[in-house]
Regions:
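N-terminal organellar transit peptides
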Residues: 1-109, 115-214
């Protein structure tokens, strides 16, 4: 779910799993090894902490080699719009092609990041599910505060729809209608809609060469 707010205190991986620091160290080892292969993994809700890590990894890999592709694997239920847009903007900012691969679930903000991958390099595994809906968030305070929050909500909704329309080739009116409520897509349906360019079954189907953007 794409929210306008995030929890004040994100739960650490080891705490969420009921483990100890050893599990956290193992996760770090795996993710660092993947990073050496130019693979970034988004496998959780999109929070400030997660977005800062992914943005830093994108910038690091771009600095190491501004031409080689970066592979972003996505298994996410969504999260904060603002945190997600930081990742989105960084993907567009660097010169590298960022290939996106959906596995499990790419929902809400995860869906936007999936379709924002480099043209021709947006993929999904056969049983991945893609979900699109409009941003949501709570409102409170005085009448003036609520009016300001409502205006911001409408701006965010329009921006989100315009970005999805741009990357899928659908028009904004169609995106608005289709995202009014949760809409789920299979990988094949996501291909037809324009979220992805190909349904893949093996890692060899994801190219690892130089990017094509100018």
């Amino acid at each position: 779910m794409t929210d306008l707010h995030i929890p004040a205190m994100p739960i650490r991986v080891s705490e969420a799993r009921g483990g100890d620091s050893l599990s956290g160290n193992l996760d770090d080892t795996v993710f660092n090894r993947l990073l050496k292969e130019r693979i970034i993994f988004l496998g959780s809700e999109v929070t400030d902490q997660v977005a800062n890590r992914i943005c830093a990894q994108l910038l690091l890999l771009a600095a190491e080699d501004p031409d080689r592709d970066i592979n972003l694997y996505i298994n996410s239920p969504g999260g904060s719009v603002y945190s997600g847009m930081a990742i989105y903007d960084t993907m567009q900012y660097i010169t590298n092609d960022v290939a996106t691969i959906a596995m499990g679930m790419a929902a809400s903000m995860g869906q936007l990041l999936l379709c924002a991958g480099a043209p021709g390099k947006r993929y999904a595994l056969p049983h991945a599910r893609i979900m699109m809906h409009q941003p949501s968030g709570g409102m409170g305070g005085t009448a003036s505060d609520i009016a300001i929050q409502a205006e911001q909500m409408l701006y965010t909704k329009r921006m989100f729809q315009e970005r999805v329309a741009f990357h899928t080739g659908q028009d904004s009116a169609q995106i608005e209608a289709d995202s009014d409520r949760d809409r789920w897509f299979t990988a094949a349906e996501g291909l037809d809609y324009g979220f992805i360019d190909r349904v893949i079954t093996g890692a060899t189907q994801v190219p690892t060469g130089a990017g094509t953007r100018n």
